[in-house]
Amino acid sequence: MRLTVVSVIAFFISTPVFAQDSGAIGFGTVAEAYAALRKDAKAEFLIQEGWVVAKVTEGPHSGVWSFTPNTHPAHPAVIKRFPAEIGGQIAIRMQALCGGPKPACDQLVEHFKKLNEQVARDIQQRKGGK
């Protein structure tokens, strides 16, 4: 998922805020989310280390959607990350929808929280270097 961090840096510019809210992701199942994004003309899909990543730059599905590979312990699962204004600053919001076992889903969410924190550190380092 290292490539995801690099590509997400270009998409998000701020301190991360974490919110796991599977109801707010807008779909009842991971399969429904995937099917809807496949129909979205604004969705750009790529495969990164077995993960299906959909980048949607505008519209109701706006954000970066990361779908677990079939071999992932939390599969089927999707993590949606998107920018949101919180307290006057742009932050990374995150929503998860996971059909796998709870412990694996919890680990998946923690993994993405760490990725978000790394993005924030990378951005702060870039700001400090200017």
Which ranges hold each PLM region?
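N-terminal secretory signal peptides
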Residues: A19-A77
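C-terminal partner/receptor-binding element of secreted or periplasmic proteins
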Residues: L97-K130
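Positively charged n-region of N-terminal signal peptides that target proteins for export
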Residues: M1-T4
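Short, surface-exposed coil-to-beta transition loops
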Residues: P73-K80, A91-R93
